[in-house]
From Swiss-Prot:
Primary enzyme class: hydrolase
InterPro entries: DNase_TatD-rel_CS, Exonuc_TatD, Metal_Hydrolase, TatD-like, TatD-type_Hydrolase
Alphabetical keyword list: Cytoplasm, Exonuclease, Hydrolase, Magnesium, Metal-binding, Nuclease
Coiled coil: none
Protein name from the UniProt record: 3'-5' ssDNA/RNA exonuclease TatD
Length: 260
């Protein structure tokens, strides 16, 4: 089982990053993709991945929250990072019209620029979409023939949005959001609609701690070592064996991100 979304650069991991990675290994997690959300964190993510060759990789990109800081210098930084063997995707990039930390036009500009970069470098894209599906799809669609792959990270949309993402050829990233009885029930019902070869799993640690873990962790911080719980629950709701699902999502991640 491979965790495609770990925010290991977060200050919440500042005191025990190495132990976090060790616990993930001990839990049977077969690899980690460390998320880059701005130029600085993308550089930090690449360095962290360097420390764990063959186990950790990273993305390089600018999250829509940070889109207002996009510049030609940012693009050049990402391009340089993408030359390293650790960086296997462009992103996290996309649109977030829920919190609007950057203006919509800034988000759209940075998103389009990163799709162009991914097409140029022939790297898959690690996508973010929240309450912005129509504009997200409109910007993404023209680039699809030029992209080598894409995943809708932390998908939390509707059935119609899921069907649209699948029709665009996207892989679907599912997090512990689906384990939340308050807001994950609709998503839970959609799990069987995702083709096995398009499904990816992620913790989005330190965020989105699964709410249905028993006993509950003493800390509210999520960790990649909790991925087996997500695998177990998603397998249950898809009516398949957890071991089979774990092997499938590991295979899917390695295929999408072209890992050795």
């Amino acid at each position: 089982m491979f965790d495609i979304g770990v925010n290991l650069t977060s200050t919440q991991f500042a005191k025990d990053r190495e132990q976090v990675v060790a616990r993930a290994r001990d839990a049977g997690v077969t690899g980690l993709l460390i998320t880059g959300t701005n130029a600085l964190e993308s550089q930090q993510a690449q360095r962290l991945a360097e420390w764990h060759p063959g186990y950790c990789w990273s993305t390089a990109g600018v999250h829509p929250h940070h889109a207002s800081a996009w510049s030609a210098e940012t693009a050049n930084t990402l391009r340089r990072l993408a030359e390293s063997e650790q960086v296997v995707a462009i992103g996290e990039c996309g649109l977030d019209f829920n919190r609007n930390f950057s203006a919509h036009d800034q988000q759209e500009y940075a998103f389009d620029a990163q799709l162009q970069l991914a097409a140029e470098l022939q790297l898959p894209v690690f996508l973010h979409c929240r309450e912005a599906h129509d504009r997200f799809a409109a910007i993404l669609q023209p680039w699809l023939p030029k992209l080598v792959g894409a995943v809708a990270h932390c998908f939390t949309g509707t059935r119609e949005e899921l069907e649209a993402c699948l029709a665009m050829g996207l892989s679907i990233g599912i997090t512990g959001w689906v384990c939340d009885e308050r807001r994950g029930m609709e998503l839970r019902e959609l799990l069987p609609l995702i083709p096995a070869e398009r499904l990816l799993l992620e913790t989005d640690a330190p965020w989105l701690l699964p709410r249905d873990m028993h006993p509950r962790p003493t800390s509210r911080r999520n960790e990649p070592c909790f991925l087996p719980h997500i695998v177990q629950q998603v397998a249950l709701w898809r009516n398949e064996a957890a071991e089979t699902l774990g092997a499938q999502v590991d295979h899917n991640a390695r295929q999408l991100f072209r890992l050795a």
